[in-house]
Amino acid sequence: MPPPIQGYGFGESVDLRSFLYDRLVATRIRYMGNKHDVAPVVAELVRRRRGDRPFLDVFCGLCSVGGAVARTGRRVVGNDVQSFASLVARCLIATVELPPSPEEFKRALRCSHLYNERRLLERFGGDVAREACILADADGDAYRRAYASWRHAANDESVAAEIDEITRGGNRRPYRLATLTFAWGYFGLRQAIAIDSMRFAIDRARETGRLTPAGADWALVALLQAASCASASPGHFAQYLRPTSDEGFVRILRQRRRDIWAQFLHEAGELEPYGDPEWRRGNSVMRSDALKIWDDLDGFSSQDWIVYADPPYSKDHYSRYYHVLETLTRYDYPAAAGMGRYRPDRFATPFSLKTCVEAAMNELCCAIAERGYTFILSYPSNGLLNADCGVDPGELLREHFGRVDLRMRRPTSHSTLGARHGSARNSVDELLWVAC
């Protein structure tokens, strides 16, 4: 176990390990925005505030901060604009029901899974057999030919038209979104068929009562975890690995050989929420733009909130890195475009635009300050606001709040999001302010 984390302006050494769970993360979904290092510091800052004040995380992501705050017993509300993130947050911090066991999932899902799979194999059986031979022989040249010839929603008008027809109310069965959009890209064809069949089984189990609504949500989280583990991509979903080199093909081959059903059952056995049932019963999750949440929050409660924000800090729009997870969660058959097979309606945040980030941060601060809430802001030293625009976040906070304290400056490293050239990580300082 690491040594106690010292200082951070608390006035004495504080052992922040009590806020960390035995597991490093509560979910294995690929996500680069987790704040595992910052989370215990935020939890200690929250603990020191008046005991009945609830905690709001306006960019909650996969809830590493909300999970740390669980140890304080504070009520937590998480918010995220992405559907997949709000689903995970709901399961981890706001669902009383524990996840079903792998055996319970088997009983609830297997028959429907096999039904959808059989329907898809009637159409794609020959293609699946060819893929299996290529993978068994580890034939890189054959793989490259098959990859180049595969037709999908982003490169074929007839497949795109089929997607559009489904969106307009056409026959959705058998489920085939991943097969038509992501096969021979992020996933193998057999894997995409399995993902679609798992999603069909989850929806059927929800409809028929074989799984409770919460149980079906847990199943979907396990499926997202299985998809994350099986995806042939560099730690995110902005792009997938292409077989342009022998090394790349070896990496793809390793991922293609993962069995989605087996991976799903493994992930199901790893699911575990934060906190105890009574704590989770008092929590809730919202799905909204962080700049538009405030009117809803005003009607939600009149309490004096402690608000935490970890806004996007780079020019990269994060929705691009998670579009596959978003599509598998919403399962709405969007159009697909480009090499990444992106959905066209990906969320774009002003926090990632150089011309808009200062105004967005001012708008966020104004909404919090005018309501008299305490604001905890996390931002790196190389963020778009300070490094590119020359605006000191601390000074910006002082324009809105009477007291602003820098409570943490900690060296860390950030992923370069799969950049092809240079270091995979950048050394930066993680900064944390408290404003009230």
Kindly label every feature range from the protein language model.
Residues 91-174, 181:
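Conserved phosphoryl-transfer catalytic core
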Residues 2-56, 64-71, 86-88:
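S-adenosyl-L-methionine
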Residues 17-19, 39, 44, 64, ...:
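SAM-dependent nucleic-acid methyltransferase catalytic core
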Residues 314-371:
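SAM-dependent methyltransferase catalytic-core segment centered on the flexible catalytic loop
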Residues 394-436:
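Class I S-adenosyl-L-methionine
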Residues 76-80:
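Conserved SAM-binding motif I beta-strand of class I
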Residues 351-405:
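Conserved Class I SAM-dependent methyltransferase catalytic core
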Residues 59:
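Conserved glycine-centered beta->alpha loop in an early N-terminal alpha/beta scaffold
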